[in-house]
A protein has these predicted regions:
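Membrane-embedded alpha-helical bundles of multi-pass transporters/translocases
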Residues: 1-519
Length: 519
């Protein structure tokens, strides 16, 4: 089974890598166009709201609730029942998200006032930042319909993933990045406010992503006519699982939204600095954490349906090993090379050396929580695959409260950096509580072999950090030209990878070990 997981994981990771690279290209284009100016803050705000809902409907609670039920129905091998279930789910979800999108467009000023309260207060008091409120309200009308298209895309992708067709859904985000980049180059020069071109890129990207997946769904024989099915037994089961999961699986996104709310009261640039650092954090998180979580959920669901407790625990252990192997060194690399990485990728046009420096502080704080973010992604399926959504909700409530407390403690003295620290701490608490819950339910307890493996990874990472510090000592990175920056950063990363890999090799760890559940 682990060989199949590795193959599926590599497929998802490869497609995700392509998407993340294009995502970085997109962010470079945005940084060059707007840097960390007011318009950039507004676009990131207008894009964050529908993206928050996307994570709930398309990637978060819906997928966690839908895939286990779909796996159960698919296991019955009744094609007609399967098609009817898909028709009712797609019809019900489609109606809900299109109505949600319409309401969002109509009340966009209210949404902006709610989550951008700092701008709204300035608007009421005729202060300069009040213009951000008007711009954000107008831009949100364009970006909000994205939620409808991407939710149906998420449904299609979940169906294909359940059928072990992972490549299509993993490739789909590439199209959004292409659309945003194209609009930035083709539409922005013709607009008085270039940020609107990016908003239209999001809207068009949603349509293109859905259109891309439909032919693959047709080939799978599951492109059926949507029907309203609120009382369909399968839909009722998905609803029952999804309602609590809406909160439990999206704690991290809710925390980021709270960060945006607080950041609207901080100095101009705060939202942009958090955005750019979050984007770099999302690169390893998506490439490794989300990729592993994507392939593990259908597998765990099948283990649960087949009452394979040993297989369930073994696959969970494999997932924890993989995110530890990738997450620990990635977190250290991002933390100790934050400013050089931001400078090489983004520093051009309106994105200055000062912007890179400011964003590097929040990236360091986010990097501290990277492993926790990844662990949450792979531990949560341990609940949802067993159709247990209540426990993550209880954990989510505690983590939400903790994040608010951490924000109060750290945001006042440290500003936007404090928001990133609070998010990382709440993610760490989330991962710890998820694991404690699984162990108490006797579903999964980390094995001794995995603990030993993690210790070896941590030691290797310490050696890697020493190599990074040695390479970077005495280097005034901000004073280098771009070519020299690229050479310096590349050599540092190559040495770091070589030291990390060499240490693992000296500990007797080989590639073949990841093809089995125990080693």
């Amino acid at each position: 089974m682990s060989k199949k997981l590795i193959k599926s994981g590599l497929i998802v990771s490869t497609m995700t890598l392509l998407s993340r690279v294009l995502g970085l290209v997109r962010d470079v284009v945005i940084a060059r166009l707007m840097g960390a100016e007011a318009a950039a803050d507004v676009f990131f705000f207008a894009n964050k709201i529908p993206n928050f809902l996307r994570r709930l409907f398309a990637e978060g609670a819906f997928a966690q609730a839908f895939i286990p039920v779909l796996t159960e129905v698919h296991a019955e091998q009744d094609e007609q029942k399967l098609k009817q279930f898909v028709a009712h789910v797609s019809g019900t979800l489609g109606a809900i998200v299109f109505v949600t999108a319409l309401i969002g467009v109509i009340i966009s000023p209210m949404i902006t006032a709610m989550f951008g309260a700092g701008w709204f207060i300035d608007y009421l008091n005729d202060k300069p930042d009040g213009a951000k409120f008007e711009l954000a309200s107008a831009m949100l009308k364009i970006t909000f319909p994205y939620i409808a298209f991407i939710s149906l895309t998420g449904l299609s992708g979940a169906i294909l993933n359940t059928l072990n067709k992972f490549a299509v859904a993993a490739f789909t985000p590439v199209l959004l990045n292409i659309c945003i980049i194209a609009c930035a180059y083709l539409l922005a020069p013709a607009m008085s406010e270039p940020a609107f071109a990016l908003a239209w890129g999001v809207f068009i990207g949603g349509i293109v992503q859905l259109g891309f997946q439909l032919p693959f769904l047709f080939r799978a024989g599951l492109l059926v006519k949507p029907k309203w099915g609120w009382r369909d037994p399968g839909v009722v089961k998905v609803r029952t699982l999804m309602i609590p999961a809406l909160f439990g699986v999206s704690v991290g996104q809710i925390n980021l939204l709270l960060d945006t709310f607080i950041a609207s009261f901080l100095v101009t640039g705060s939202i942009s600095w958090l955005y750019y650092s979050d984007r770099l954090l999302e690169f390893p998180l998506g490439l490794f954490g989300i990729a592993i979580a994507t392939v593990i959920l259908p597998t765990l669901s099948r283990n649960h349906v087949g009452k394979d407790e040993l297989g369930f625990s073994g696959n969970m252990d494999w997932a924890v090993r993989m995110v530890s192997l990738l997450g620990i060194p990635a977190a250290a690399g991002l933390g100790f090379l934050a400013e050089p990485i931001l400078s090489v990728i983004f520093q051009r046009g309106a994105f200055t050396a000062e912007t890179a420096r400011m964003a590097s502080y929040s990236l360091m704080a986010y990097a501290f929580g990277l492993l926790s973010f990844m662990l949450v992604k792979v531990l949560a399926p341990g609940y949802y695959s067993r159709q247990d959504t209540k426990t993550p909700v209880k954990i989510g409530i505690w983590c939400m409260a903790a994040n608010m407390l951490f924000n109060l403690i750290f945001a006042i003295p440290y500003g936007y950096i404090g928001l990133a620290i609070a998010t990382s701490l709440s993610a760490t608490l989330n991962a710890a509580l998820l694991y404690i819950g699984l162990s108490r339910q006797k579903v999964y307890v980390v094995s001794r072999l995995t603990l030993g493996f993690v210790a070896r990874v941590m030691f290797s990472t310490c050696a890697m950090v020493a190599a990074i510090l040695w390479m970077q000592q005495g280097v005034d990175f901000t004073g280098l030209v771009l070519r020299d920056k690229i050479v310096s950063l590349t050599l540092t990363i190559l040495l770091a990878v070589a030291v990390f890999g060499g240490c693992l090799f000296s500990f007797g760890i080989r590639v073949r070990h990841f093809k089995s559940k125990a080693f």
